[in-house]
Each structure stands twice: as C-alpha cells, then as structure tokens.
C-alpha cells in the first residue's frame, strides 16, 4: 500500500521547524491509584516522537485513554500519568496541555502532550469542524496508532483529510508492511491459526481466510464446532451447534481449492474446567458425553507443528487450548515452538496470543507481533482500515 512515511520526510529534512501532530496509542492500563501497570504502548510510541524531535520539529502528541464523556475531563481520564512516564523515557520535560483544540504553544525541539483527545466534542463522530481545527494546529500530521486504525475518528481520520501533509509513523508503517507481506504477497504455503472460544466472533475472519490460506488451523471452542461439523462427538465441550452449517461451508470451500482445515485426531479432555482436573488424552472419536475438550492432543500437535515448520507464511490469532492451565497448555506450547522454529514469516496478534508468546519466550522468533487487537482482526477479515485508506488517498492525490 502506497503511503507517505514520516521517516522519509525526516530524512529529507522536511520536518525541520515544522509543527508535527502525532496521533499515538497511549491507552495504557492503570490501577485504582492511577499508576500505570503496563507501559508497552508508551515505550512503542517513543521512536516516532524522538524521530520528530531529532528532525527539529515542534512536536504535539495526543492519544485517547479509556472511554471518557465528550466535553468532560475527569482526573481518571487524564493523560497526566502518561506525560510523567513519557518524560522519563524521553529524558526531557513533557508538559500536558488541556483545552488545546484552538491553539498550542510549542517550539522546535520541544514536545507537548495534548490531553485525552476523546474528551473533545466531535472526536468519536469525526465532525468536520473539529477535524479542520486540529488540522490547523500542524504542518504535518502523523498517525502512529495502529490500535485505533480501524476507527474513523477525528484524530485518526478527519485530521488526515485536512492537514497539509498526512503520513504514517514508524509503528503504523511497520504494521502496513507486515500485513502486506503476510496477506497480500505471502510466501506459500500460507497457514493461519484462528482460535478462540466462539466461531460467531471470528466467522468473518474464517470465511475471509478460507479463500486465501493453504491450511486453516482452528483451535479452542472454534475447533469444537468444526469437530461437530466433521461428525465427531465433543461431549459437553463449549461449541456453537447452530453454526455447524457455517463451519461445514468453510471446510467445503477449502477442500474445493485443494486446501484444508485440519480436524484434531486426538484431544486432551477433563471432567471439569479447572487447573487441577485430571487430564486424559483421547482419540477424537472416543470423546465421552461428560468430557470437556480443553486442548489438542499430542498427535494433532505434532502434525500441526510439522505443517507450520513447512509453511512459507504463518498468521497466528489465538491459543489452541486452555494454556493458562499447565495440564492443557501442551498444544499451544507446541504451536508456539513450531512457529519459533519455522523459517516462515510469521505475524501474530490478539491479547491471548501475545500472552502465549510472552509465556513461551518466543518474542524474538515471531516475524511481527501486531499491537492492535480489533484492528488486527479487521485486517484478517479482509477490510481496509480507515486510517490506511485516508493515508493512501492523501499520498495518491
């Protein structure tokens, strides 16, 4: 996808002395006392801000935090803790500016944090009045927030329509490149792992991927519904019997293309859903009426691992079992290790997937780890994200 990149503007000296407005994703979790409990997103925003400062720009940064009521800023909605953390990471003062829509004082070489953008009236609905006011604040607009790229809001879309220059920051550029590499021009075979508790939440993804991928590996509650579609008994496992026909349609669509949905041949079951429930490996044809399927079995895990090691590209969204329980983590662990050992380009995303990657320490062995939950899922659904669309439009005339 052709877009203007902020790194190129900086390299060409076009940001010197310019007012740069960066939309970052600084929406971090906090405890009841307002202390930041996990700062990955803040750390991830630093390279773009530093790039702008090093280029001699006057830098404004904003983000949303939570879901505030438009027009009202409460202490809980304030970016004050984020400003403090940013100043530590950047090694310079980062003043926090409230009521900033009508004007911001900032000099080249300085950075200010503009208070929670979702407090501004018109942000969520992307009103032209707000977008035009924000565009007047800057010479260059930079979107570096992939996590909100699927939302057409004032700071993610509207401002990009009216700003003199609209471009992508390093984080957003990396996401665009990785997604293109995995889905637009993938090295074959292309394997996708789509797992989770419900087919209903991922049905669009399953359908979209079924005409692109060579192997569509399903896991978790989704796999149980596919096992029902294949005529297997799943006992009292979590599934959606009303979506069996949809699962069958995905299986048939894949088969018609010479591709496959590998159905588990063995599973790990228990009688209750608990960490200390005795785990039993069974053939997929031997599941009893009172069994709960909580993981794929070793035979299935080995087969899938072999497929992943032979893949050219891997897309991973979701653990294949209840990996939080040691007795039912082996399937997800085997998948994670196979991805780590595979020469394939891999892209992974989604909260549980990131937790599994961290648990098995394979961060450095995954080609690209996507930070955007909902945005990543919409890409897998085959949608063009609003933030990508407007930057592409601006870059092409």
Curated annotation (Swiss-Prot):
Pathway info: Carbohydrate degradation; glycolysis; pyruvate from D-glyceraldehyde 3-phosphate: step 2/5
Entry GO MF terms: ADP binding; ATP binding; phosphoglycerate kinase activity
Full protein name: Phosphoglycerate kinase
Complex formation: Monomer.
Enzyme class: transferase
Family annotation (InterPro entries): Phosphoglycerate_kinase, Phosphoglycerate_kinase_CS, Phosphoglycerate_kinase_N, Phosphoglycerate_kinase_sf
Positions annotated to bind substrate: 25-27, 41, 64-67, 118, 151
Pfam families: PGK (PF00162)
A Gene Ontology BP annotation from the UniProt entry: glycolytic process
Catalytic reactions on record: (2R)-3-phosphoglycerate + ATP = (2R)-3-phospho-glyceroyl phosphate + ADP
Keyword entries, A-Z: ATP-binding, Cytoplasm, Glycolysis, Kinase, Nucleotide-binding, Transferase
PANTHER family assigned: PHOSPHOGLYCERATE KINASE (PTHR11406), PHOSPHOGLYCERATE KINASE 1, CHLOROPLASTIC-RELATED (PTHR11406:SF23)
Positions with a binding annotation for ATP: 202, 324, 350-353
Compartments it resides in: Cytoplasm
Record's GO cellular component terms: cytosol
Organism: Paracidovorax citrulli (strain AAC00-1) (Acidovorax citrulli)
Top-level taxon: Bacteria
Signal peptide: none
Family: Belongs to the phosphoglycerate kinase family.
Protein EC: 2.7.2.3
């Amino acid at each position: 996808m052709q877009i203007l990149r902020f790194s190129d503007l900086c390299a060409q000296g076009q940001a010197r002395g310019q007012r740069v407005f960066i939309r970052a994703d600084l929406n971090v979790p906090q405890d009841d006392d307002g202390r930041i409990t996990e700062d990955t997103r803040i750390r991830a925003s630093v390279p773009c801000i530093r790039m702008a400062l090093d280029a001699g720009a006057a830098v404004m940064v904003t983000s949303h935090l939570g879901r505030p009521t438009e027009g009202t800023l409460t202490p809980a909605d304030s970016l004050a803790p984020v400003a403090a953390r940013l100043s530590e990471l950047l090694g310079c003062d980062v003043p926090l500016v409230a009521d900033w829509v009508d004007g911001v004082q900032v000099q080249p070489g300085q950075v200010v944090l503009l208070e929670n953008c979702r407090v501004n009236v018109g942000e969520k609905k992307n009103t032209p009045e707000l977008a035009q006011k924000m565009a007047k604040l800057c010479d260059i607009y930079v979107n570096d927030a992939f996590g909100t790229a699927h939302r057409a809001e004032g700071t993610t879309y509207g401002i990009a329509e009216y700003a003199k220059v609209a471009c992508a920051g390093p984080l957003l550029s990396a996401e665009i490149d990785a997604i293109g590499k995995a889905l637009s021009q993938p090295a074959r075979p292309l394997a996708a792992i789509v797992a989770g508790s419900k087919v209903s939440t991922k049905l669009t993804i399953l359908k979209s991927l079924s005409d692109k991928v060579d192997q569509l590996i399903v896991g978790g509650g989704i796999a149980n519904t596919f096992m029902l579609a294949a005529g297997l008994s799943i006992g009292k496992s979590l599934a959606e019997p009303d979506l069996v026909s949809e699962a069958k349609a995905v299986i048939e669509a894949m088969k018609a293309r010479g591709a496959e949905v590998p159905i588990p041949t063995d599973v790990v079951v228990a009688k209750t859903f608990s960490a200390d429930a005795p785990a039993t490996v069974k053939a997929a044809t031997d599941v009893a009426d009172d069994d709960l399927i909580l993981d794929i079995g070793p035979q299935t895990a080995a087969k899938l691992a072999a497929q992943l090691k032979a893949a050219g590209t891997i897309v991973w969204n979701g653990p294949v079992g209840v990996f939080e329980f040691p007795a039912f983590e082996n399937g997800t662990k085997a998948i994670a290790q196979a991805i780590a050992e595979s020469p394939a380009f891999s892209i992974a995303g989604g909260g549980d997937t990131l937790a599994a990657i961290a648990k098995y320490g394979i961060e450095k062995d995954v080609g690209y780890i996507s930070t955007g939950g909902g945005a990543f899922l919409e890409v897998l659904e085959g949608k063009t994200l609003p933030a990508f669309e407007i930057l592409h439009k601006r870059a092409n005339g």
